Amino acid sequence: MAENPSLENHRIKSFKNKGRDVETMRRHRNEVTVELRKNKRDEHLLKKRNVPQEESLEDSDVDADFKAQNVTLEAILQNATSDNPVVQLSAVQAARKLLSSDRNPPIDDLIKSGILPILVKCLERDDNPSLQFEAAWALTNIASGTSAQTQAVVQSNAVPLFLRLLRSPHQNVCEQAVWALGNIIGDGPQCRDYVISLGVVKPLLSFISPSIPITFLRNVTWVIVNLCRNKDPPPPMETVQEILPALCVLIYHTDINILVDTVWALSYLTDGGNEQIQMVIDSGVVPFLVPLLSHQEVKVQTAALRAVGNIVTGTDEQTQVVLNCDVLSHFPNLLSHPKEKINKEAVWFLSNITAGNQQQVQAVIDAGLIPMIIHQLAKGDFGTQKEAAWAISNLTISGRKDQVEYLVQQNVIPPFCNLLSVKDSQVVQVVLDGLKNILIMAGDEASTIAEIIEECGGLEKIEVLQQHENEDIYKLAFEIIDQYFSGDDIDEDPCLIPEATQGGTYNFDPTANLQTKEFNF
């Protein structure tokens, strides 16, 4: 933490008209990253998954097969309650095939037909594992639909039976039950906590062993991810404590799908507040997480960057745990990565380091990352520029004079000022805050900073912002103009007033108060 917390907070508040404090500076992923998060979930981590056809039949072939047999929902419903096990299995299988169609499976039609209680009843048939398997598959695909469709499965009292099937001696039945539970848990925190309350965690984790087939382990890991999802509310602390040792084992796995899901699970846990961050740290997984930032697979890097990024939204002490793992050595490559979204996440991470204490700010400087942040400020796409603006502005609050001076020497002001003309009010305010902090920190050298701002076109932009609709912005712009660009400096500085000679003429000293771009605050 800062050497004198009360002094540090006073300094922050004196610099920031908005009273931006450490909590504000350290930013969790918020609405500006919704698109990024959704893209990742769509690409890697679907909350719910439909089980496709086992056979290689096209949908049209399946439909034609049903039509040829004149199979109707009424017939399926009637035959699914038959006393003839062959007829019953065939009917449940027909329902499953309908639900496994890639194109618009008729989930609502089947729910309305009243088949759910029949399928749930089939889960009880320990004497007929094939029937249990087909019924579980059909219910899995119903639960892969909308929230209302998932709720229909839950309300049919299927969950206790799926949990019971986790102890089935037939592996395909176990695996199908795991898949079904994953879809139900993935519906949201209410379903997640309901399934947890019925005791899903221990039997689920018991499947993690060297002998488990890789496809089964992938499903188990995916369900663990869903257990870690959602932070409103986050999963129960006892559940997190149970899951973390399993994640510490799975992070060594050589299968990329399992590794990616494991790291995403950790990223969800670290997104749940400082208490959960501490639990992840205490598990000892961080030293194994950090090296994944340089993994050859981009999807592993992406997940790892999010996980460590969430950790550094915590306290200075929690942030230091990550820094102690030599995390900054991975950032030159991340900041120059061909994928823009990696650049953006990397700069977001660093913005939370520059929101830390002065030693942490110095670590970013010593790692040679400031010029790379400034490059992203100037050349990155807008989302990355926005994160870079936060990184710079945070440094102007947290940093010492010499650290802010270094920032200016790296020519931060021109690209910083360029962002004053964007439409995003938050970015404009962050930049104005940063510029004002630099001017305050410069003290007697403020006129040099003002000159740089004017030469790069920043003054003109600040003048325009005095007419901004946002009250905070126009007040801040006015204050900067009034204090540093008021035009009456000559009246205030006697050194600039020429001395009168005996002949009544004035003698100007050409060396008086000449400003240079080389300066020390």
Swiss-Prot record:
<keyword id="KW-0225">Disease variant</keyword>
<dbReference type="InterPro" id="IPR036975">
    <property type="entry name" value="Importin-a_IBB_sf"/>
</dbReference>
<feature type="repeat" description="ARM 10; atypical">
    <location>
        <begin position="447"/>
        <end position="485"/>
    </location>
</feature>
<keyword id="KW-0597">Phosphoprotein</keyword>
<feature type="repeat" description="ARM 9">
    <location>
        <begin position="401"/>
        <end position="443"/>
    </location>
</feature>
<dbReference type="Pfam" id="PF01749">
    <property type="entry name" value="IBB"/>
</dbReference>
<dbReference type="GO" id="GO:0043657">
    <property type="term" value="C:host cell"/>
</dbReference>
<comment type="subunit">
    <text>Forms a complex with importin subunit beta-1. Interacts with DDX21. Interacts with NCBP1, NCBP2/CBP20 and NCBP3. Interacts with RCC1. Interacts with ZC3H11A.</text>
</comment>
<dbReference type="GO" id="GO:0046718">
    <property type="term" value="P:symbiont entry into host cell"/>
</dbReference>
<comment type="subunit">
    <text>(Microbial infection) Interacts with HIV-1 integrase; this interaction might play a role in nuclear import of HIV pre-integration complex.</text>
</comment>
<comment type="similarity">
    <text>Belongs to the importin alpha family.</text>
</comment>
<dbReference type="GO" id="GO:0061608">
    <property type="term" value="F:nuclear import signal receptor activity"/>
</dbReference>
<dbReference type="GO" id="GO:0008139">
    <property type="term" value="F:nuclear localization sequence binding"/>
</dbReference>
<keyword id="KW-0007">Acetylation</keyword>
<dbReference type="GO" id="GO:0005634">
    <property type="term" value="C:nucleus"/>
</dbReference>
<protein>
    <recommendedName>
        <fullName>Importin subunit alpha-4</fullName>
    </recommendedName>
</protein>
<feature type="modified residue" description="N-acetylalanine">
    <location>
        <position position="2"/>
    </location>
</feature>
<feature type="compositionally biased region" description="Basic and acidic residues">
    <location>
        <begin position="18"/>
        <end position="29"/>
    </location>
</feature>
<keyword id="KW-0539">Nucleus</keyword>
<feature type="repeat" description="ARM 4">
    <location>
        <begin position="195"/>
        <end position="233"/>
    </location>
</feature>
<feature type="domain" description="IBB">
    <location>
        <begin position="2"/>
        <end position="58"/>
    </location>
</feature>
<keyword id="KW-0677">Repeat</keyword>
<comment type="function">
    <text>Functions in nuclear protein import as an adapter protein for nuclear receptor KPNB1. Binds specifically and directly to substrates containing either a simple or bipartite NLS motif. Docking of the importin/substrate complex to the nuclear pore complex (NPC) is mediated by KPNB1 through binding to nucleoporin FxFG repeats and the complex is subsequently translocated through the pore by an energy requiring, Ran-dependent mechanism.</text>
</comment>
<feature type="region of interest" description="NLS binding site (minor)">
    <location>
        <begin position="306"/>
        <end position="394"/>
    </location>
</feature>
<dbReference type="GO" id="GO:0005654">
    <property type="term" value="C:nucleoplasm"/>
</dbReference>
<keyword id="KW-0653">Protein transport</keyword>
<dbReference type="GO" id="GO:0006606">
    <property type="term" value="P:protein import into nucleus"/>
</dbReference>
<dbReference type="GO" id="GO:0005829">
    <property type="term" value="C:cytosol"/>
</dbReference>
<keyword id="KW-0813">Transport</keyword>
<dbReference type="InterPro" id="IPR011989">
    <property type="entry name" value="ARM-like"/>
</dbReference>
<dbReference type="GO" id="GO:0005643">
    <property type="term" value="C:nuclear pore"/>
</dbReference>
<dbReference type="GO" id="GO:0006607">
    <property type="term" value="P:NLS-bearing protein import into nucleus"/>
</dbReference>
<keyword id="KW-0963">Cytoplasm</keyword>
<keyword id="KW-1163">Viral penetration into host nucleus</keyword>
<dbReference type="InterPro" id="IPR032413">
    <property type="entry name" value="Arm_3"/>
</dbReference>
<feature type="repeat" description="ARM 1; truncated">
    <location>
        <begin position="66"/>
        <end position="106"/>
    </location>
</feature>
<feature type="repeat" description="ARM 7">
    <location>
        <begin position="319"/>
        <end position="360"/>
    </location>
</feature>
<dbReference type="Pfam" id="PF16186">
    <property type="entry name" value="Arm_3"/>
</dbReference>
<feature type="repeat" description="ARM 3">
    <location>
        <begin position="150"/>
        <end position="194"/>
    </location>
</feature>
<feature type="repeat" description="ARM 8">
    <location>
        <begin position="361"/>
        <end position="400"/>
    </location>
</feature>
<feature type="modified residue" description="Phosphoserine">
    <location>
        <position position="60"/>
    </location>
</feature>
<feature type="modified residue" description="Phosphotyrosine">
    <location>
        <position position="484"/>
    </location>
</feature>
